[in-house]
Every structure is written in C-alpha cells, then in structure tokens.
C-alpha cells in the first residue's frame, strides 16, 4: 500500500517530523487545529508568489512561533522588514496570541517537492504544455542531485473532454522503504477547463544512521549490549577435542581397515605363485 498512503505520514518519527508541534487537551484541541488550518490557508494565498515550501507552527506557553520555509525570503520580508510586520499583525489577529515569525531559506528549490508542484501548476495556468513542464522539472531535479523523481498530473489535460492521468518517472522512487528520504508535494492548477492536480515525489537518498546517507563510506550503527553486561558470543560448533584431533589437516579423509605390522613382512617372505599354463590340466584330466 505504499502507493496509497501519504509518504510523509508513513515516515513520521522515522525520518520526517510533524508540521504542527504543540499539545492540547480534549476541549481545546479542535479549536487549535482549526486555527492551524486557517493560518496555512492564509499564508498560501498571501505568499503565493514567494515560493513557500513548508510552514511549521509551534505553540509555546501562550505564544505562537511560525517558521516559513521559502526559496525567496526577500519577497516575504519586504523592504526594511515592512511586509513581515504586516504579516505578523495579521497572524496575531487570526490566532489571538503573540506570534513570532521566522523565515528559513530553501537552498535547492529544484529538489523540493512542494515547490516543484507549485511551479508546474503556475505553468499550466499560463497555458504551457503539461508534458514540457513536467519533463523540464524532472531534468532540473536530477541535475541538482535527486536520485529519483516522479510527477503525476490528473484532470482535463490539454482541455480534452475526458479526464485522464499521466505520470513520468526518472531514477528510483522507493515508496515502501522507510529509510528512504522521500519528499512529497501536492498542488492544484485552476485552468479554464477545470482543476488539474499535480503530485510530486522526490527521492533524495537512503538514510542509514543519524543523518548518514547511503554510500557515504560510513558503516551502519552497531547495537552494543548495556553497560555492565558481558557480550554474548556464539558457542563453538564443535567440541575442542574433535577440533584438535582433526588439526593435522587430514580431516575428512576416508580411512580403510587397519593392517597389522607383520602383514608387510609376510608378503615379503611368501613366494610368488607360478602362473598355470593353459592346457596342462586338460591333458591330465583326459
């Protein structure tokens, strides 16, 4: 079922982390969750042209901390920080608590799944051919270090009457492997023919240990016994006596029945039998 489950939710607490980090009791949980959804929708509309890939919401005691990951942080901050102050005021009204806004830059937007999906959606809204947009995004991702990428588009592609689904893949995209660092993003393109959905999977490598990538020349972490306990070793397969008996290097050889020491002497003293000529016994018998 690797194709059906959400790749990020499948890898939570293994490789991925939650986008909302806070705790609440049963009564206040629905309201806080609704606030998070409204904040994300507001930021998606407000920062549509700022290339926002991810939004992380944290709630310390009676405060809120929002971290925005963007490939264009200058667009979010604005001139002398004017835009970010307006954004902070709007978020405080929306959440009802003091809000701290942090901006983090995405170094490689070409291998960020959400940014790839948003970019393809913007191109489809500008009437660019969907195959050209998908293949160009795949080439850029593979050129900048992605080990695999898969892009799927669904809807009335090119304005046809019957909706269909097309997808392209390059490299490896292991959906079932938990240690695979798989990035996933979804976006929608609102065209004149209807809504076209875009899904993107980007495989960045396998994580072996703590932040170690496969093929980096480091071995996998070994599991050691607790302190104070002796190491359990595998018992020997053969007893020590049998191993010593066969240490002469003749183990496995088949040995015949033992002969006495006098057998060689007897064979030397016995006279050899003369061969019987054919026809002598026949004449005597006649």
UniProtKB/Swiss-Prot annotation:
Pfam families: KH_2, Ribosomal_S3_C. The keyword RNA-binding applies. It comes from the Bacteria. The keyword Transit peptide does not apply. GO terms for biological process: translation. CDD domains: KH-II_30S_S3. One of its GO terms (molecular function) is mRNA binding. Residues 241-262 have a biased composition (Basic and acidic residues). Residues 213-286 are annotated as: Disordered. One of its GO terms (cellular component) is cytosolic small ribosomal subunit. PROSITE patterns: KH_TYPE_2 (PS50823), RIBOSOMAL_S3 (PS00548). Keywords: Ribonucleoprotein, Ribosomal protein, RNA-binding, rRNA-binding. Residues 39-107 form the KH type-2 domain. InterPro entries: KH_dom, KH_dom-like_a/b, KH_dom_type_2, KH_sf_prok-type, Ribosomal_S3_C_sf, Ribosomal_uS3_bac-typ, Ribosomal_uS3_C, Ribosomal_uS3_CS. Belongs to the universal ribosomal protein uS3 family. Binds the lower part of the 30S subunit head. Binds mRNA in the 70S ribosome, positioning it for translation. Part of the 30S ribosomal subunit. Forms a tight complex with proteins S10 and S14. This is Small ribosomal subunit protein uS3. The gene is rpsC.
């Amino acid at each position: 079922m690797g194709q059906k489950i959400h790749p990020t939710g499948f890898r939570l607490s293994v490789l991925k982390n939650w986008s909302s980090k806070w705790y609440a009791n049963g009564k206040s949980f629905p309201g806080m969750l609704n606030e998070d959804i409204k904040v994300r929708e507001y930021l998606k509309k407000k920062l549509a042209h700022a290339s926002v890939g991810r939004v992380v919401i944290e709630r310390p005691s009676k405060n809120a901390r929002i971290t925005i990951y963007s490939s264009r942080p200058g667009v979010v901050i604005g001139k002398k920080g004017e835009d970010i102050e307006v954004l902070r005021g709007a978020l405080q009204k929306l959440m009802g608590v003091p809000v701290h806004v942090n901006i983090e830059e995405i170094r490689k937007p070409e291998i960020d799944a959400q940014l790839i999906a948003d970019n393809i959606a913007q191109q489809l809204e500008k009437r660019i051919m969907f195959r050209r947009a998908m293949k160009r995004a795949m080439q850029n991702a593979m050129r900048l270090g992605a080990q695999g990428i898969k892009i799927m588009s669904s809807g009335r592609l090119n304005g046809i009457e019957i909706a269909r689904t097309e997808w392209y893949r390059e490299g490896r995209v292991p959906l079932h492997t938990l240690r695979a660092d798989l990035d996933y993003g979804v976006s929608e393109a609102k065209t004149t023919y209807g809504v076209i959905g875009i899904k993107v999977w980007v495989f960045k490598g396998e994580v072996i240990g703590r932040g170690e990538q496969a093929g980096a020349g480091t071995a996998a972490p070994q599991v050691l016994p607790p302190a104070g306990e002796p190491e359990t070793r595998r018992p020997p397969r053969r007893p020590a006596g049998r191993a010593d008996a066969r240490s002469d290097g003749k183990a496995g050889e088949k040995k015949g029945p033992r002969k006495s020491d006098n057998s060689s002497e007897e064979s030397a003293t016995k006279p050899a039998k003369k061969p019987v000529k054919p026809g002598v016994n026949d004449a005597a018998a006649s």
